[in-house]
């Protein structure tokens, strides 16, 4: 039809024009009109009549009924109503929405094809949705929730004086009853480990800074958290399978660093195992951790773990957050989580911050120890269990005598590629520090062994070495953790390596013992034991899982002093005590592991 007729009247800004097409109605059906020579006349400032000399009308009949036009009008009305919000919608929000929708579509498709194969992805997705909804719910109704629980909170505070002793007694009775029934089935090794745990608590109390002012809630709740985690992870099938699966996934993930090492160093990079195999894992993991920090995952995870310890143990937000952070990052990085607040924390909090760093290992070196052949699941479990242990020991060894004043806020900005690059660059110093320390300590150890052998030869004892001396010193401590008496001498030597040098040398030595056991062969060669039982290996893995050594002592003093110069004197005064507390925290974790381990008497 070539006609000239008024198509529409109204405000020109509201003219329903879309890509040279006009939607209109004729009788009960939709007409889609393509126009040319469009003209208009302004009758007043509000109304405009549009004319078209050449109008090509396409009649679609019953295929497009009237309700489609209503839907179109509803969409236009919605856009007009929310035009401000739509105009200022951020593109990143749109990208996130599209990405989440695509991800959910992939999850649904994968579960439809093979649910068993997609079960890990499904579980991770459900957990992510749960925590996102939980955060939204808490953020929106936080005041109402606090008001709802405030009467119960006030009642607990009034009754806490006697209630805390009832809970502590109940916890002790439950552990003792469980030990009695469990020992009748599995032997007396668990009792030795539990006795070692009690021994370390008593020793910390005897040498406490203020033994009469100990707050027992963090102590008993920290040990209770250790037992709960140990039982869930080591004695329940679901917990053991979950952490075993996590350990395997971490080990598989870290093996991707081999691609970069192979490209840079060539196909025979494993000929220099430590330099070209182990250290690239540190670089790769540091990069990944930096990226996770950028996207906010690490802050969220550390915050949740820290909140659990803060609520359950009654520790302050600063020390709880740092203890949680030490599960994933190193002892010099975790204080950066609370950097603005370090000048204002109490001496006990400062001691707890340093103890948490000494009692755990960094995620970046976790992969290096795994590459030695040490169990990834046990290393992961040890890192988690030592976090509450560090706070328990710290509050026992240096009780709080001041009033904490600090609350927390957070923030970090960086783009993803910058975060990845920054993580890789940061790892340069870490890798260099590891390499030079291993070189210098091994050289020093060789010199000490040679000198001690010369001295021992004067008294017809040429086999005198630094390891032997450490073995005799730490042998009682290793035995009280639950290590077999025949293996306690070897584990004592490993503890000496870890304390006076670093845990790298100790885990390297432990890996050789594990390899000797896996190869089989004679247990004794020339009167020297070549490997240990599996139980002793696992307990040693837990006992060595920490940065408590003299090399780290200087690192912590220098790092914290640069962050909080006003606390220089307090840092220097409490650092050595914190190292001892971190060592004992690792020993207590090993005792708990020895108490709940499934292994029977060899």
Regions found by a protein language model. Give the residues of each.
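Intrinsically disordered, low-complexity non-transmembrane regions of multi-pass membrane transporters
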Residues: 2-27, 31-101, 130-170, 249, ...
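Juxtamembrane and boundary regions of transmembrane helices in multi-pass small-molecule transporters
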Residues: 56-73, 128, 132-144, 179-182, ...
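Membrane-lumen (extracellular) interface motif
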Residues: 90-98, 104-126, 160-163, 175-195, ...
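Interfacial/capping segments of alpha-helical transmembrane domains
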Residues: 143-145, 190, 215, 220-223, ...
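Core transmembrane alpha-helical segments of multi-pass membrane transporters/permeases
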Residues: 219-239, 259-293, 423-450, 483-490, ...
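Short amphipathic alpha-helical coupling elements at transmembrane boundaries
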Residues: 244-255, 300-314, 323-326, 340, ...
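Alpha-helical membrane segments and immediately flanking helix-loop junctions
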Residues: 310-366, 370, 416, 491-592
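Transmembrane helical segments that form the transport core of multi-pass membrane transport proteins
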Residues: 425-526
């Amino acid at each position: 039809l070539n006609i000239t007729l008024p198509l529409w009247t109204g405000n020109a800004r509201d003219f329903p024009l879309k890509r040279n097409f006009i939607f209109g109605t004729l009788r009960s059906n939709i007409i889609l009109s393509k126009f040319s020579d469009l003209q208009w006349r302004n009758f007043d400032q509000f109304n405009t009549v549009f004319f078209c000399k050449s109008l090509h009308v396409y009649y679609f009949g019953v295929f497009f009924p009237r309700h489609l036009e209503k839907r179109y009008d509803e969409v236009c009305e919605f856009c007009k109503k929310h035009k401000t919000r739509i105009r200022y919608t951020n593109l990143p929000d749109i990208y996130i929405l599209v990405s989440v929708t695509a991800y959910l579509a992939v999850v649904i498709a994968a579960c439809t094809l093979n649910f068993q194969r997609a079960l890990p992805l499904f579980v991770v997705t459900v957990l992510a949705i749960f925590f996102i909804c939980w955060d939204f719910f808490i953020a929106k109704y936080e005041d109402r929730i606090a008001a709802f629980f405030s009467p119960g909170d006030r009642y607990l505070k009034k009754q806490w004086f006697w209630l805390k002793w009832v809970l502590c007694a109940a916890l002790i009775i439950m552990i003792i009853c469980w030990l009695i029934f469990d020992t009748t089935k599995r032997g007396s090794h668990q009792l030795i480990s539990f006795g070692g745990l009690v021994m370390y608590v008593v020793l910390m109390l005897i040498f406490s800074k203020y033994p009469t002012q100990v707050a027992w809630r963090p102590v008993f709740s920290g040990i209770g958290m250790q037992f709960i985690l140990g039982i869930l992870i080591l004695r329940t099938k679901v917990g053991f399978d979950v952490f075993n699966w996590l350990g395997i996934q971490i080990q598989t993930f870290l093996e991707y660093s081999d691609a970069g090492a192979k490209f840079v160093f060539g196909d025979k990079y494993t000929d220099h195992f430590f330099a070209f195999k182990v250290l690239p894992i540190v670089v790769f993991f540091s990069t990944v951790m930096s990226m996770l920090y950028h996207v906010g995952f690490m802050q969220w995870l550390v915050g949740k773990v820290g909140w659990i310890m803060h609520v359950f143990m009654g520790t302050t937000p600063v020390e709880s957050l740092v203890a949680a952070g030490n599960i994933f990052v190193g002892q010099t990085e975790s204080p950066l989580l609370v950097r603005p607040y370090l000048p204002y924390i109490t001496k006990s909090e400062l001691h707890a911050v340093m103890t948490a760093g000494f009692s755990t290992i960094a995620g970046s070196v976790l992969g290096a120890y795994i590459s030695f052949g040490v169990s990834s699941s046990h290393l992961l479990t040890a890192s988690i269990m030592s976090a509450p242990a560090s706070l328990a020991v710290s509050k026992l060894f240096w009780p709080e005598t001041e009033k904490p004043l600090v609350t927390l806020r957070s923030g970090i900005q960086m783009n993803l590629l910058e975060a990845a690059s920054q993580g890789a660059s940061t790892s340069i110093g870490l890798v260099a520090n590891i390499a030079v320390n291993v070189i210098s300590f091994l050289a020093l150890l060789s010199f000490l062994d040679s000198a001690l052998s010369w001295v021992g030869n004067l008294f017809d004892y040429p086999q005198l070495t630094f390891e032997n001396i450490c073995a005799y010193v730490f042998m009682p401590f290793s035995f009280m953790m639950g290590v077999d008496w025949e293996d306690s001498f070897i584990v004592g030597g490993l503890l000496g390596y870890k304390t006076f040098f670093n845990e790298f040398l100790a885990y390297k030595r432990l890996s050789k013992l594990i390899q000797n056991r896996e190869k089989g062969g004679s247990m004794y060669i020339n009167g020297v034991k070549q490997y240990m039982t599996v139980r002793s290996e696992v307990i040693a893995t837990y006992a060595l899982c920490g940065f408590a050594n003299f090399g780290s002592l200087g690192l912590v003093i220098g790092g914290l002093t640069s962050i909080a110069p006003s606390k220089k004197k307090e840092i220097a005064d409490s650092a050595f005590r914190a190292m001892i507390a971190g060592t004992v925290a690792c020993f207590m974790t090993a005792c708990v592991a020895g108490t709940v381990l499934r292994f029977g008497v060899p």
